[in-house]
Amino acid sequence: MEDFVRQCFNPMIVELAEKTMKEYGEDLKIETNKFAAICTHLEVCFMYSDFHFINEQGESIIVELGDPSALLKHRFEIIEGRDRTMAWTVVNSICNTTGAEKPKFLPDLYDYKENRFIEIGVTRREVHIYYLEKANKIKSEKTHIHIFSFTGEEMATKADYTLDEESRARIKTRLFTIRQEMASRGLWDSFRQSERGEETIEERFEITGTMRKLADQSLPPNFSSLENFRAYVDGFEPNGYIEGKLSQMSKEVNARIEPFLKTTPRPLRLPNGPPCSQRSKFLLMDALKLSIEDPSHEGEGIPLYDAIKCMRTFFGWKEPNVVKPHEKGINPNYLLSWKQVLAELQDIENEEKIPKTKNMKKTSQLKWALGENMAPEKVDFDDCKDVGDLKQYDSDEPELRSLASWIQNEFNKACELTDSSWIELDEIGEDVAPIEHIASMRRNYFTSEVSHCRATEYIMKGVYINTALLNASCAAMDDFQLIPMISKCRTKEGRRKTNLYGFIIKGRSHLRNDTDVVNFVSMEFSLTDPRLEPHKWEKYCVLEIGDMLIRSAIGQVSRPMFLYVRTNGTSKIKMKWGMEMRRCLLQSLQQIESMIEAESSVKEKDMTKEFFENKSETWPIGESPKGVEESSIGKVCRTLLAKSVFNSLYASPQLEGFSAESRKLLLIVQALRDNLEPGTFDLGGLYEAIEECLINDPWVLLNASWFNSFLTHALS
């Protein structure tokens, strides 16, 4: 690769790349892919600025031949390729003369025509992924980002590509040539894959024998043994040294390491605003099932047959009416959609043979509810270059929402036991090794604790719905297919039971990419009156569709039955993960196993049996405003499972960000509790990173409020 770079790139570029790598302490003999990447990036920056000038009238012009006259000024200032001190000097002088805002990171170019700094990216991956990484790092509206890929794709801020078509084509052609040259030498694959570096963690192992001798031989000068060197590293006082290094980087960096004390952290600031609303793909605690026991009807197991059989168990249907409208939707359309489902189910029943699947008639109400013909038409860019006001959509900032009590109630319900079993105990073969015996014993204990848990019902419901929807999306792309929402369980007496929660109607689903969206309308039965917590049901139109007789302590009472209707959407990748929800069982089992392992290592014997059978012992299950909550091992299993299930049901970028950033603060607090005297710099920045994820997501807001309870008790 090094030979290729020296042949392929201009010697001046190679020399600059060597300097850059030296400045960062990297060895170009080892980091050959990085060497190639730096040269490529430098060349793209130079090509970007080549031939572009500004004339006396302040217009941008292109001059390719001969010497430009003295009155022309270069349009771009090249910052990339200078050493850091010089680069910051150039940036500071540009900011002073033009009034531009000083960037946090060194940009690559400055554009005197558009008066903005430019960050150039060259990626071997998807342009949009790299663009987002750059944007997240820079976090500045002012710096313009322009990404090129080796496949000829590009992406720029607000689709503003700065340069003319021909100049950009020159860059793309050059990148394509580099790629082909690398490929012909067998270097491309390694170069392409090297863009994402994986972090490695070195454990502190005891080193003996030959490795020990090698370690002693490879110490820095002035250290006699590995122990000496380790003692020096462990006792190293970082403040002055790190500050010195950082001050060479940027004039604004200040990293005095502050001690982190009990009084240091503050609670997370949760947003104010209207209460957050339900956003799961199906109802959770509010769902109502129409069930048949010991199903043995003809076509048992075919969803549509099962659904019709379940529907026949209920006799309290009545003329539906809207009791809680959807603020922004056309509510009569939701009402008509339900009436259409009832009518078309009735039509099926009148047929001699019930079909296996049902495609709904494409009525105006369903077209509206499924967003048919609502997507803007895609037009080829070349066909509309001359349109004056062509621009990307403006997207509004999401509205801040406050934490509402319903999400804690949802979580509590998910931890409870139902009176049915939702998973079977695996029929496991004979154990061969002792370790298998322990593993299957743990699995059986765990399964018996969670098989009746409501979170397990949500798993099976989620797996069923996502599988059915993904199948229908591939098999009937153009059809509005009716998909019953079904689950299966066993009663206390071991009898099989089939449950119907409601229906989904799928919209058009030509899903080429993982993230392409399929719209669907969900219609779900419930006994919950939406008027009790209207804010929870903001995205729903709720109909009253019947009266149900409920057995209660005072005999039979009649309760209104509701139908929760909403338009929703999902994608191939979300459905794929939804189908994998059983993994939540595995994740929570592994967490329980690590607790058992910790106990076992203290007692020096396997504690599985005692762990599950000692009913008097309690274990911590979480924090609440009252303090650390403790409970039985069964409740611990169910709580861990519910957390894992909610992470899946309420998966979102806000949750990803909150989990990653709050974990850093959690580790610092735990280090303080373990008397490890942690130090931090830019704690304010960490709080900012955590709090920018607290927007409107109910599960993230609940986790943040739990985190605050943890902070209070951990530091009191």
UniProtKB/Swiss-Prot annotation:
Modifications made to the protein after synthesis: Phosphorylated on serines and threonines by host kinases, including human casein kinase II.
Cofactor(s) of this protein: Mn(2+)
Subcellular localization: Host cytoplasm; Host nucleus
Pfam families reported in the protein's UniProt record: Flu_PA (PF00603)
Motif Nuclear localization signal 1 (NLS1) positions after renumbering to this chain: 124-139
Coiled coil start-end: none
Bound cofactor: record note: Binds 2 manganese ions per subunit.
Domain of life, source organism: Viruses
Residues engaged in binding Mn(2+) 2: 80, 108
Keywords annotated in UniProt: Cap snatching, Endonuclease, Eukaryotic host gene expression shutoff by virus, Eukaryotic host transcription shutoff by virus, Host cytoplasm, Host gene expression shutoff by virus, Host nucleus, Host-virus interaction, Hydrolase, Inhibition of host RNA polymerase II by virus, Manganese, Metal-binding, Nuclease, Phosphoprotein
GO cellular component terms listed in the entry, alphabetical order: host cell cytoplasm; host cell nucleus
InterPro entries the record matches: INFV_PA, PA/PA-X, PA/PA-X_sf
Residue positions of motif Nuclear localization signal 2 (NLS2): 184-247
Assembly, per entry: Influenza RNA polymerase is composed of three subunits: PB1, PB2 and PA. Interacts (via C-terminus) with PB1 (via N-terminus).
Family: Belongs to the influenza viruses PA family.
Protein name (record): Polymerase acidic protein
Organism of provenance: Influenza A virus (strain A/X-31 H3N2)
